[in-house]
Amino acid sequence: MELEHQTMETFLRWAADIGISDSIDSSRCSDSCLGHSLSVADFPLAGGRGLRAVRELRKGELVLKVPRNALMTTESMVANDQKLNDAVNLHGSLSSTQILSVCLLYEMSKGKKSFWYPYLVHLPRDYDLLATFGEFEKQALQVEDAVWVTEKATAKCQSEWKEAGTLMKELDLKPKFQSFQAWLWASATISSRTLHIPWDSAGCLCPAGDLFNYDAPGDDLNYSEGPESAIQTSSPQPASITNLECRNNEEEAGLNVEIQSERLTDGGFEEDANAYCLYARRNYQLGEQVLLCYGTYTNLELLEHYGFMLEENSNDKVFIPLETSLYSLASSWPKDSLYIHQDGKPSFALVSTLRLWLVPQSQRDKSVMRLVYAGSQISVKNEILVMKWMSEKCGSVLRNLPTSVSEDNLLLHNIDKLQDPKIRLEQKETEAFGSEMRAFLDVNRLWDVIGFSGKDVEFPRRTNRMMSKWRLSVQWRLSYKRTLADCIYYCNEKMNNLLGTLR
């Protein structure tokens, strides 16, 4: 811990030396780039290491300025290394993200000789992005779409690694820096930590700027959306090209309209300042964690690109299997607009499509179509059918999943116990473990490790990493199931109210 503190001080001093500062006073001399507005702090329940306000901050106030020469980009790395520059120029077929990944590994291979060493030593050793999930953690997601996204992310990473292999060999990287595990690390670093820059789609690594933890878009930027209101959709970008903007796409009454976007006060690269400028996105009190918004993401997208998820995420969406004939009726809305909000309310597009789908084809005249596209109820009986169908569909999806909400809650509780080295498990507790917990212990050969000697439990690092990813899988699927359960409750309540009007 003391060594970590010392290396952090070294990094902050190095950052100050190259012009990074949390003060607008350019003449201010300091042995740290922080201290005027921000300081490094630990937030165990809110993202871990982050930045806290050391004074009151006002919305829109500049809180960190990182000059262009301090940004870690492909441009800045090849400019100071002829060997790297010559090798990169011979591989124009590689994507900008692949090139940046190779450059990052090349700098890592230099060790203390790298100009970026004070920054590189503070990068995480491990990440929890979906591409890093093993077979056990992947299957623990349970939901077919989530498993597919994970497999796709892993396959993409493997393909990009193989394509970049020749360049890494030409740079004479040591075998450990050419390995797939090293590539996974570099790819995850770039996916989760880069910020948008206008001259390179791969983005940049921003020393000190990547200490901020994530904040979801505020309520002031979200539209309240239920079956009778406008629909909000979002199209997440890969993390490496996210530019700290949150975009809200609004479709009025099911019609495709021009995208409405609002730039947040978080910041971006400013040409006139020749620096990355980051701003307070709201007012902060002394001691509060200062956060940045990367964009609008579902929890699965956050896991894919960043390696974490949010318990409360107003941008989360749950997709359920729908009949092919239903999709054919939804031509006025994108398929990704047919979803359930995290609070359990079906989206405008999903409800509107169901209203039309549940009307006999012979009765789908112009008057019905006008009501559908206006977002209006066709009839009380039709609305009851819609709510009944949604409730039964969600119930069917829940029943077909391997575990229930209560079982997942218990499993999360047991995982937390395993992760706490101070908690000694009693024999009767381990005997009550469910099949998934037992499978995890079997795979990792941990039955002896969690013995009953009364000593603190210490798992191997690899096991702890696997457990963290497994916990995220269970946490994600639990959120998915809760949304379905909330949708059942919402639909049943609405159905009962509608039935009351018929009496």
Task: Identify the function of each model-found stretch.
Residues 64, 291-292:
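Hydrophobic beta-strand signal
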Residues 57, 88-94, 124-144, 212, ...:
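Eukaryote-specific, cytoplasm-facing alpha-helical/coiled-coil scaffolding segments in long proteins
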Residues 111-185, 189-196, 208:
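C-terminal globular interaction/adhesion domains in large, modular proteins
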Residues 218, 222-225, 291, 303-305, ...:
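Short conserved micro-motifs at the rims of enzyme active sites and ligand-binding pockets
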Residues 2-48, 56, 67-83, 92-93, ...:
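Charged low-complexity "KEKE/polyampholyte" interaction tracts
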Residues 226-231, 296-297, 307-312:
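Active/binding-pocket-proximal capping segment
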Residues 2-83, 174-199, 203-281, 286:
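Conserved AWS/pre-SET-to-SET junction and N-terminal core of the SET lysine methyltransferase domain
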